[in-house]
Amino acid sequence: MDWGTLHTVIGGVNKHSTSIGKVWITVIFIFRVMILVVAAQEVWGDEQEDFVCNTLQPGCKNVCYDHFFPVSHIRLWALQLIFVSTPALLVAMHVAYYRHETARKFIRGEKRNEFKDLEDIKRQKVRIEGSLWWTYTSSIFFRIIFEAAFMYVFYFLYNGYHLPWVLKCGIDPCPNLVDCFISRPTEKTVFTVFMISASVICMLLNVAELCYLLLKLCFRRSKRTQAQRNHPNHALKESKQNEMNELISDSGQNAITSFPS
């Protein structure tokens, strides 16, 4: 797996992210990717070789291991990181499309006053508004869904986040209920809790960023509405509307008073 490519893609999105989004990217690569690549692979590197059962029945050990660990912790975490990071591609593609359209308009002479050259367009920080706001918030929403889904799958597959010292297995072809042991269960439990905690932190950061974007949108719309109300044209329209209402009211009163009794 090429983690450098993943870092390049998400690092490009980091330029256009909010402050909370930049913290999320830092947590992803320092507390999850680095731990997974550097430490977790060393801890889980011997998981099947050192899985021992107190029986010599052929096939019993393999069947019990497959029953208790249907998917490797490392592979599941790697798959989770891929799914969680993939929505960032939506933002990257949207920004690339925006820059392409801006460069095309610049070549046709429509954006000459805003940019000096094409390199200036590439260096521009795209603001999260308009259609990009919807793309960005959608990517955050999908990240939250993926984080929650993988945490549930992890809990469902392994019956919790704690690795026991002894596993009881009575699946065929085991002759009876046998005891199986995994290597370094305490250390693996610590790493498991750490990775789950990092997932929870990332999910909370995503929720906080989503709330921040929603509040910012409401504030921007409120400010825009207030500016429109304070605009001279808006005041002139209100003045004309009030005059029309007064004329209609006066004409109605005159019609009532002139009506023969």
UniProtKB/Swiss-Prot annotation:
Subunit field text: A connexon is composed of a hexamer of connexins. Interacts with CNST.
Membrane topology: Multi-pass membrane protein
Stretches assigned to the Cytoplasmic side: 1-22, 99-131, 216-261
Gene Ontology molecular function terms on file: actin filament binding; beta-tubulin binding; gap junction channel activity involved in cell communication by electrical coupling; microtubule binding
UniProt key word Repeat: no
Naturally occurring in which organism (per UniProt): Mus musculus (Mouse)
PROSITE patterns: CONNEXINS_1 (PS00407), CONNEXINS_2 (PS00408)
InterPro entries: Connexin (IPR000500), Connexin_CCC (IPR019570), Connexin_CS (IPR017990), Connexin_N (IPR013092), Connexin_N_sf (IPR038359)
Entry protein name: Gap junction beta-6 protein
Primary localization: membrane
SMART domains registered for this protein in UniProt: CNX, Connexin_CCC
